[in-house]
Regions:
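Noncatalytic luminal/extracellular "stalk/propeptide" segments of secretory-pathway proteins
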Residues: 49-175
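Soluble metallo-hydrolase cores and metallopeptidase-like ectodomains found primarily
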Residues: 24, 102-107, 117-154, 235-336, ...
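Acidic/histidine-rich catalytic neighborhood of metal-dependent amide-processing enzymes
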Residues: 182, 186-188, 213, 323, ...
Length: 544
């Protein structure tokens, strides 16, 4: 019955979404391309130095965001401050020697960053493994609901290092009843592999890299290998002495020297009854670590609800980026215009729409611009532990992350499609704009687990992570497909991600402001909460 009521409310709201007959429609009209352009160009400006946390440029960026939150009329998170300080431990790792894999046939010598990467969250200046025994643990998964335990039966795991396959057993499958088929589950994320290894008490975990399974090439693994960040209270979360990656061809040779074929093992490891086994091989590696304790702020403002409630709706758009990187045509500054200056502009403009309402929504509206998303959404992890309003009373979170300025779109691509009834609500709201919802066609890469909404999801809060992406209104689907491929190859996390005042088309971003204001407005005024799909892996986390 609740589903019918909510869809009815969404339909009634959608009927008026393109008119001017209610206060929300009038409030929406304050949104403008000019504001979005001004915000984006300021946050992606060279003076912000790529917004790497702890830099002078980052200080300028968060200061600007706080000023704009105040100008919009948002209430500060603490006293008169819009900053929520997040205690961070920054670590830098250098591996001064090759990793050595001793097999029955040879010793493989791997150069750091080329054949392997290694790090540890342990606060120790030096970590050395000498001839630690290796074992093959399939996908490194313990999933009782699928009858799978890739660590079952291994003796003395505390002395050994697990070699595991990236992603999960559903990769490439059309059977959605088993690990969601080709749609990655959290079991497929690298973060989970290290977490599970720590729970099993192993000495280390080495993930076998493969582009499609990881969702990115080796260059991304290599780029993040030198430095890591942790929320200080969480610094032992991945507490194996060794967390690392090895190139696929290295793993292929290692296993061949032990009498196994990697492709056959991948097929075997997909089965529920797969059992791990020891390899007649060892690993030796040395890591030298330096640490620094610092603080970096989340920027948070909110609009108090009119219903005297501690319930809330949360909008997300992270402010941090990468600073400097490998130069392209002499430019090494990674401005982060599409990742994620546009999302902060989107969030600020939605805030302006809410402030333009003659009466505040029933629920509180929180606008959270977290720090350290690029290093594991640390700011959001901290926020869910220290929230402005109780996490169990957050109706939903709405997140935008990575949005190229290509103009209007017909689609609304939902990453994490099928997890909750937010999908059907959004479908109704999108229709008056001539838009339709669709699942992310690249869900195998686990993008749902790779942005700031995910710490909320882990606490049982439904999330909407969506945007126009696959069907450009002016140029069509094939053009969009070509642009997406070009974006990942030439712009994402590169100095080319900057504003282009003469050609940037903000009309698509304005679409997202209007649509997701509509969604937030409905969530902020309805009774009850969105519902998880009973088949979602997060359906039973939070009961309410």
């Amino acid at each position: 019955m609740k589903q019918i009521v909510l869809l009815g409310l969404a339909f009634a709201w959608a009927l008026s979404a393109c008119g001017g007959g209610n206060p929300a429609d009038r409030a929406k009209k304050v949104a403008s391309v000019e504001h979005l352009k001004t915000y984006t160009e300021a946050i992606a400006h060279d003076s912000c130095e790529g917004r790497r946390p702890f830099s002078a440029g980052a200080d300028r960026a968060v200061g600007y965001i706080a000023e704009q939150m105040k100008a919009v009329g948002l209430k500060p998170v603490s006293g008169e401050s819009y900053f929520q300080p997040v205690p961070i431990i920054s670590s830098r790792t250098v591996c001064p020697e090759p990793m050595r894999l001793r097999t029955p046939k040879q010793t493989l010598s791997l150069e750091w960053l080329e054949g392997y990467t290694a790090f540890s969250a342990r606060i120790e200046p030096e970590i050395t493994l000498k001839d630690a025994p290796l074992f093959f643990a399939g996908y490194g998964i313990v999933a009782p609901e699928y009858g799978k335990n890739d660590y079952a039966g291994i003796e003395h795991p505390e002395d050994k290092v697990a070699v595991v396959i990236v992603n999960d057993p559903g990769l490439g499958s059309t059977d959605e009843s088993y690990f969601n088929g080709d749609i990655m589950t959290y079991y497929g994320r690298w973060m989970y592999k290290f977490e599970e290894g720590a729970r099993q008490g192993v000495k280390g975990v080495l993930i076998i890299h493969e582009d499609r399974g990881a969702g990115y090439p080796w260059s991304v693994v290599r780029a993040s290998a030198r430095s890591k960040m942790y929320v200080e209270s969480d610094s032992e979360a991945y507490h194996c002495p060794l967390n690392g990656w090895i190139q696929q061809e290295v793993a292929r040779q290692l296993l061949a020297d032990n009498g196994y074929d990697l492709d056959q093992l991948i097929a075997e490891a997909k089965k529920p009854d797969f059992k791990p086994f020891d390899l007649k091989s060892t690993v030796s590696v040395k890591m030298e670590n330096t640490f620094e304790r610092q603080e970096s702020p989340n920027v948070v403002g909110y609009i108090p609800g009119s219903g005297e409630t501690d319930e809330s709706v949360v909008y997300l758009g992270h402010w941090d980026h990468l600073g400097y990187g490998a130069p392209i045509n002499g430019d090494s500054l990674i401005n982060g215009a599409t990742d994620n200056a546009v999302a902060i502009a989107w969030m600020l403009e939605i805030a302006r729409c809410f402030e333009a309402l003659p009466k505040a929504s029933r629920r509180n509206i929180v606008f959270l611009s977290p720090t350290c998303e690029e290093t594991g959404f640390l700011g959001t992890k901290y926020y869910v532990e220290h929230p402005l309003f109780p996490i169990e009373k957050v109706a939903a979170v709405i997140n935008l992350d990575v949005f190229p300025l290509w103009g209007e779109n017909n689609d609304v691509t939902i990453t994490g499609y099928g997890n909750s009834d937010l999908d059907s609500t959004l479908a109704v709201l999108a229709k008056p704009y001539g838009r339709y919802i669709m699942p992310d066609p690249d869900a195998y890469n686990g993008m749902f687990y790779r942005s700031d909404h995910f710490p909320f999801v882990q606490r049982g809060v439904p999330a909407m992570f969506a945007k126009g992406w696959n069907d450009n209104r002016q140029h069509g689907k094939e053009w969009a497909k070509e642009q997406i491929a070009k974006y990942w190859a030439e712009t994402y996390h590169k100095p080319t991600d900057q504003t282009h005042p003469e050609s940037d088309d903000y009309s698509g971003l304005l679409q997202e402001v209007q649509l997701f204001f509509d969604l937030g407005y409905q969530l902020a005024n309805e009774e009850g909460y969105p519902k998880w799909n009973p088949k979602s892996e997060f359906a039973n986390v939070l009961k309410r």
